[in-house]
C-alpha cells in the first residue's frame, strides 16, 4: 500500500510472496524483492516494472536490502554457504560444517559485475569467540542492511557478530569495524550495541 501525505490510500496491490522489502530507493524508484524468482524489481512512478535485478556468478540475491543508485548501478548481496573445518577453531566444531558467509555485488546499468566482495577474504571465524558451534549451520555473517557512506564506501550491518563494517568500494579492504569482538572503537559510558538490524549513513 502507498499512502499520500494525508494518509489517503493512493495505490494498493497484493503480490503475495513477491511483495517484500518495498521502498522508494536512492534513484527515487520503487523497488521490491520477489521471493519466488529471488530477484529485485524496479518500478517507475506509474508502477510499471522497468527492470529486474539478480545476483551474478551463480549467487542468489538475498531479500534483506538492495540499493538502486542514481547513476543506474545496483548493489545487492548474497549469503554464501561453504563447508568449513571448524574443529580447528573450537572443540565444539566439526570437520565439515556449513558456514554462511557474505558476497556483495555492484552491477552497472547493464547488469555487469563491476565490484564483487567476499567475506571469506576478510573475516576469520577465529576472531569471534562467541560463535555458537553447536548449530548444524553456522550463520557467521548475517548481513541485514547495506548503505553507502558520504565518502562513497559501503557500510554493512552483520547482526550475528554485532558489527557494523565499512568496506572500501574499490579495493574491498575493511576501513573500520564498529562493535563486536574486533571493534576499532570503544564505548565510553555506554553499553555496546548487539544484534542490530539496520545501518544508515547519516553524513
Predicted regions, residues:
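Histidine-/acidic-rich catalytic cores in large beta-rich domains
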Residues: 1-203
Amino acid at each position: 500500500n502507498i499512502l499520500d501525505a494525508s494518509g489517503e490510500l493512493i495505490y494498493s496491490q497484493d503480490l503475495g510472496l513477491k511483495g517484500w522489502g518495498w521502498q522508494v530507493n536512492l534513484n527515487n524508484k520503487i523497488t521490491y524483492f520477489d521471493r519466488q524468482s529471488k530477484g529485485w524489481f524496479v518500478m517507475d512512478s506509474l508502477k510499471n516494472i522497468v527492470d529486474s535485478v539478480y545476483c551474478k556468478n551463480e549467487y542468489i540475491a538475498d531479500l534483506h536490502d538492495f540499493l538502486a543508485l542514481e547513476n543506474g548501478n545496483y548493489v545487492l548481496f548474497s549469503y554464501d554457504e561453504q563447508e568449513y573445518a571448524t574443529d580447528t577453531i573450537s572443540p565444539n566444531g566439526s570437520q565439515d560444517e556449513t558456514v554462511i558467509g557474505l558476497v556483495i555485488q555492484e552491477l552497472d546499468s547493464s547488469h555487469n559485475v563491476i565490484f564483487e566482495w567476499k567475506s571469506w577474504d576478510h573475516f576469520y571465524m577465529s576472531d569471534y569467540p562467541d560463535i555458537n558451534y553447536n548449530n548444524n549451520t553456522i550463520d557467521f555473517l548475517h548481513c541485514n542492511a547495506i548503505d553507502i557512506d558520504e565518502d562513497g564506501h559501503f557500510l554493512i550491518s552483520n547482526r550475528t557478530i554485532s558489527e557494523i563494517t565499512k568496506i572500501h568500494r574499490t579495493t574491498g579492504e575493511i576501513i573500520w569495524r564498529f562493535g563486536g569482538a574486533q571493534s576499532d572503537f570503544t564505548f565510553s559510558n555506554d553499553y555496546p550495541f548487539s544484534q542490530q538490524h539496520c545501518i544508515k549513513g547519516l553524513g
